[in-house]
């Protein structure tokens, strides 16, 4: 039950100082707004913002980004036992989120890339809830895909409605997912899910790369060889792009390799060798196909991973989504079409079944129940010696 007296006091305090907060000449920033208003609002909605329950990091209800550090992630990740359910993006009151479209586009991009169906944007003066089933476009206005908009003077009056959308009890009871299923359909209409779109993009590269190599003959006349080398090259490019968005160290950015067409292939090979030395994962240790591909096809592939061609934020896309994409990717293989070009076809053992991934919530529960006690008190080296069987 939300404490209406506390909520009214919060609203009254904001109202008494709103002119100061909204004056851009004053030094009232997002940091202060989060501490004084947005954190308390989330707490009144039941969320343990400060982790007063002392939960382990992987099970925190709210993951808040550092107040004083500007990151490329949403300010709050709201979770169900550690599984992200929606984001909250915060702005200072001087930012008019009802007129300035940039915060809305940013919020929608965050939600879409995480495959969430709603996201919250607030400067406390307003609380906006966005439908994030749709790709955000740079020319969208701030009202596009906006599902609800509340002024702070409405918070007390409409608290039941707000609670029914984003409160902790709503999420933990299952009502949140039921509401989304009824009101935020993930398919149909103009919706395009991030995993479906990215898989389609990968398959386009797969076919383009394969046809270019197949035309050269030799070892590339083998579909088995093509399957392996093309998959490996795509993995390498996507891995490097993910490293960039996650701010992991690289010799230089992937995009830097395409600034000079004459140097593209040597620069990319140099980047691959550098990544192999740094990460020692074996991903870059094999024979690469860089010099067997045209600069045009490589450049097009890399450009597809950057703005403005790309809608993807790889620091937001969850690993489980990438895993799902990989699983579906592996259900198809290269096939030789009647016109002697390469296309894609379902593998025989996948033709009559679909890929169903285990929901993250269930994975976390299973791991907690089966491995937590086994790993308790062990050193990292001891944990590495544990054998785990996945019966499925």
Residue ranges and their predicted role:
Residues 1-24, 92, 163-392:
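Preference for the N-terminal adenyl/adenosyl cofactor-binding alpha/beta module
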Residues 123:
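Short, small/polar-rich loop/turn modules that mediate ligand/substrate recognition or access, typified
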């Amino acid at each position: 039950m939300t404490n209406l007296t506390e909520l009214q006091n919060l609203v009254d305090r904001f109202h008494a100082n709103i002119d100061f907060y909204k004056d851009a000449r004053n030094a009232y920033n997002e940091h202060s707004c989060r501490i004084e208003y947005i954190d308390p609002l989330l707490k009144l909605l039941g969320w343990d913002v400060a982790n007063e329950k002392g939960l382990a990091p992987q099970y925190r209800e709210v993951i808040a980004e550092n107040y004083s550090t500007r990151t490329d992630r949403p300010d709050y990740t709201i979770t169900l036992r550690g599984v992200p359910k929606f984001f909250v993006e915060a702005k200072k009151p001087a930012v008019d989120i009802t007129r300035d479209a940039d915060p809305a586009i940013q919020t929608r991009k965050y939600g879409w890339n995480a495959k969430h169906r709603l996201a919250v944007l607030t400067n406390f003066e307003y609380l906006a809830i966005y439908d994030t089933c749709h790709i955000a476009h740079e020319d969208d206005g701030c009202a596009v895909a906006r599902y609800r908009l509340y002024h702070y003077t409405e918070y007390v009056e409409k608290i039941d409605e707000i609670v029914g959308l984003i409160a902790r009890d709503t999420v933990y009871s299952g009502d949140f997912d039921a509401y989304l299923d009824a009101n935020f359909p993930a398919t149909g209409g103009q919706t395009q899910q991030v995993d479906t779109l990215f898989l389609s993009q990968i398959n386009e590269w797969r076919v383009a790369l394969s046809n270019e190599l197949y035309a050269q003959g030799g070892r590339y006349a083998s579909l088995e060889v093509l399957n392996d080398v093309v998959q490996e090259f795509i993995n390498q490019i996507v891995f490097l792009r993910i490293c960039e968005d996650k701010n992991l160290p690289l010799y230089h950015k992937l995009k830097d390799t395409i600034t000079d067409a004459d140097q593209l292939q040597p620069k990319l090979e140099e980047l691959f060798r550098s990544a192999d030395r740094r990460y020692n994962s074996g991903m870059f240790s094999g024979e690469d196909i860089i010099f067997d591909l045209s600069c045009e096809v490589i450049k097009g592939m890399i450009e597809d991973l950057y703005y403005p061609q790309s809608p993807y934020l790889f620091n937001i896309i969850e690993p489980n989504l990438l895993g799902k994409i990989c699983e579906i990717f592996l259900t198809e293989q290269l096939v030789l079409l009647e016109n002697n070009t390469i296309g894609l076809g379902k593998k025989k053992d996948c033709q009559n079944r679909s890929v169903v991934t285990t929901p993250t919530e269930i994975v976390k529960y299973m791991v907690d129940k089966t491995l937590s006690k086994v790993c308790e008190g062990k050193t990292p080296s001891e944990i590495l010696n544990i054998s785990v069987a996945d019966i499925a």
